[in-house]
């Protein structure tokens, strides 16, 4: 609910956990006060220690990013866990990521899957996408392409660019679905609309090979270049290949070598 700063401060100093959280947010965003991350941490902590899930998650983020406090992954995990156990989907997702990457906790794919699933079942598009990826790669679960597609599709249909890219990949490769290049291109297009470099490279590949679209080397080069300029190594290699072969561009070995080098 909207508070004005003075009202919020009075309530926060009286120990109102919700007001403490909102005051922390105000300091974070510089709303009605000078932006001050240390004060954000101070008020998030007071609220979090009273059990406010939003503040626990916020404090976890501050520790994970090292903003207003010294970066500390173990502290981030501690606060994410408190919020996750209260059912906060964002915290469940972030806790899953920490387990998947072994940040602040020993790496544990099964724990990652557990938290991704909790978050995904609450509708988190990011968690649905990651859970799909875990099924696709057989990480923390038995590999199951159909289950991968189920979760990836939920994410994609919510408009999440990784879900869209990964669903396109499933259609391109016939993993968990009947292979369908046109359907792959449809999902890649949605993901490139959000600037996803993997999808840009994948769409370039579709044009390069005439899969789901009419073969068009110039279009291939366009999408490879967009991905390559974002640092995508595979796209850099593909762009080098186009220059080496004069496909969609004037043949230029120097340019080819330049992009091959970047990709190495």
Language-model region placement:
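N-terminal segments that cap or nucleate solenoid repeat domains
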Residues: 1-30
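Short helix-capping/linker turns of helical repeat alpha-solenoids
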Residues: 13-16, 29-31, 36, 49-52, ...
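Canonical positions in the second alpha-helix
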Residues: 10-11, 46-47, 82-83, 118-119, ...
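Hydrophobic face of amphipathic alpha-helices that form TPR/SEL1-like repeat modules
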Residues: 22-29, 58-65, 94-101, 130-137, ...
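TPR/TPR-like (Sel1-like) alpha-helical repeat modules
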Residues: 187, 223, 257-264
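Aromatic (phenylalanine/tyrosine) cluster motif
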Residues: 21-22, 44, 57, 80, ...
């Amino acid at each position: 609910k909207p508070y004005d700063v003075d009202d919020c401060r009075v309530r926060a100093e009286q120990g109102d956990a919700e007001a403490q959280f909102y005051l922390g947010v105000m300091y974070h965003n510089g709303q009605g006060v000078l932006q001050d991350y240390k004060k954000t941490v101070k008020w998030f902590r007071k609220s979090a220690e009273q059990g406010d899930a939003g503040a626990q998650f916020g404090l976890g983020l501050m520790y994970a990013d090292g903003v207003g406090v010294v970066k500390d992954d173990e502290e981030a995990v501690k606060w994410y866990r408190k919020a996750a156990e209260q059912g906060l989907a964002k915290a469940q997702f972030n806790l899953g990521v920490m387990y998947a990457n072994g940040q602040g906790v020993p790496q544990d794919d099964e724990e990652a899957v557990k938290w991704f699933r909790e978050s995904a079942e609450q509708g988190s598009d990011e968690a649905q996408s990651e859970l799909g990826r875990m099924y696709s790669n057989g990480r923390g679960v038995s590999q199951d392409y159909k289950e991968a597609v189920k979760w990836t599709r939920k994410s994609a249909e919510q408009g999440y660019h990784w879900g869209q890219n990964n669903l396109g990949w499933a259609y391109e490769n016939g993993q968990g679905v009947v292979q369908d290049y046109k359907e792959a291109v449809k999902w890649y297009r949605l993901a490139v609309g959000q600037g996803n470099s993997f999808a840009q490279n994948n769409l370039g590949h579709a044009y390069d090979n005439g899969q789901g679209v009419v073969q068009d080397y110039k279009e291939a080069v366009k999408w490879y270049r967009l991905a390559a300029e974002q640092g995508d190594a595979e796209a850099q290699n593909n762009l080098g290949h186009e220059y080496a072969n004069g496909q969609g561009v004037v043949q230029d070995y120097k340019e080819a070598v330049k992009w091959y080098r970047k990709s190495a």
